[in-house]
């Protein structure tokens, strides 16, 4: 692997970077050798009401997984993201909002955002929301989504943000699991010129008889589109905040008080509510933001992620705002109405740091120079990538075309469960290799292990684990600590298992190779195969289903579903469309299968276990080495599947 061309650190970055190679080595060694000293010092990036004495109190031991950081300290997240900046930087822009329609944009100062958050915090209190209550937020990419999240944190309520692309069924499941007392939504969302029926989806979700906890729905008027209204339950955002005071004293929170729940797909069944707490999470989000993006005061920063994903929590809002940065929030999509939209937004707002996903980069790359037509992007200094491993071709295109061959690309590997960046370059400290996430961030101790959990040394490939805790780590799964332990700490004893595989080269750089469990990564979003299979099997005509991922040029992975129909049912183009729409309705558009492969039988072992390894190879057209098929109950099934595959048109 050493033949790969290394990108050296550009002189303009080296001259003013926050961390150089020598500092990285020294700080990294301190962070793993004396974590209490290191994190005790770094914790001062925040303002604490009651300073902490204890720094790290963590255990990955079987039966005793417990993660606590700064546990005797108190603080408030919203005060750290807003109040502490007011005296010196109250007039600095906190959020630049760029609408789906380019003629709509606005700048919101720290002073204005603070006022709006105080008003909404008082509104939540008026509605009877107390510290510890869960509030569901199902909003478009508008500043009010940030206001709602910060207001929850301000009063100590726990927010559960649900991505606006999820279906009513998925919304209901998350409301039920978290026992949300309030839902905050919008009449409609707007994306690529189309309206998204958010309020209607909430109405449908709340018709589920198992939703019993919701008392009110607060509705933001975004489009003025026609919506149904339930008197007494539904309340207009503007009516409520008009009457609210803009004075509010932020609640004193313990560092380990819950901050948010964010649902993420697992390899088994229903989504898991990942729980993050206040102190360690914000220290980690702020520190990683500052160092990985080499943030300097005055930088204009744009993270293209939706607030409904962890990237939107940590790196659209909380990390940047804790550092007093100007963060750009974009309602639209990178290639609408023209392929150059992303580049146009960069020029329009003079963006210095751009953080986006490989799926967007690949979609723009497919447009060639149309993606940069009429723009110069000269304001850019740092580029970043998130959501899935980026292929070297897309990395080089991004570096060359978007960044004019002068901006380091920080390819960040991390997860919902990690709270912030884990393996990532630092612009002034790391030479880059296209496609590699490079080296661990401070305090992160990655290892590669074999199937038995034995650590592998040197240049090698294996399962990626983390051997000790870090402040941003999720503390548990909401209401199910046993599942937390089972999912992340039972595969390899005394280690956090990421679910990803990786290889390490002779320079010690990490290359993420993708999931090793049954989780798909579609356009940078995690989807559990079990979740999609459950949705398919719930269809009245389907007997059995198995879902695998196949490589896709734009999305990274596409969804390939093997479907066995009930006796007497026949495949048809109508049923094909019906089944795809069914999954779309059950989970959301992201989960719609790209390919349905009708088949009478699936390859199973004698104990009835589906051999997914074989299904993955057949779907990907890789039939050179199907491995050992002797354990199959009926080896003839494989030939039949291969024949059926010949007739299937594959997505490009």
From Swiss-Prot:
Mg(2+) binds at residues 537, 539, 542. ATP binds at residues 387-389, 411-416, 500, 515, 526. It comes from the Bacteria. Its EC number is 6.2.1.1. Optimum pH is 8.5. CoA binds at residues 191-194, 311, 335, 523, 584. Autoacetylated. Deacetylation by CobB activates the enzyme. Induction: By CRP and FNR, in response to rising cAMP levels, falling oxygen partial pressure and changes in carbon flux. May also be induced by acetate. One of its GO terms (biological process) is chemotaxis. It holds the Pfam family AMP-binding_C. The modification N6-acetyllysine is found at residue 609. GO terms for cellular component: cytosol. Keywords: Acetylation, ATP-binding, Ligase, Magnesium, Metal-binding, Nucleotide-binding. Disruption phenotype: Cells lacking this gene grow as well as wild-type cells at high concentrations (>25 mM) of acetate as the sole carbon source, but grow poorly on lower concentrations (<10 mM). InterPro entries: Ac_CoA_lig, ACAS_N, AMP-bd_C, AMP-bd_C_sf, AMP-binding_CS, AMP-dep_synth/lig_dom, ANL_N_sf. Belongs to the ATP-dependent AMP-binding enzyme family. HAMAP family: Ac_CoA_synth. Catalyzes the conversion of acetate into acetyl-CoA (AcCoA), an essential intermediate at the junction of anabolic and catabolic pathways. Acs undergoes a two-step reaction. In the first half reaction, Acs combines acetate with ATP to form acetyl-adenylate (AcAMP) intermediate. In the second half reaction, it can then transfer the acetyl group from AcAMP to the sulfhydryl group of CoA, forming the product AcCoA. Forms a 1:1 complex with CobB/NAD-dependent deacetylase. This is Acetyl-coenzyme A synthetase. It comes from Escherichia coli (strain K12). The gene is acs.
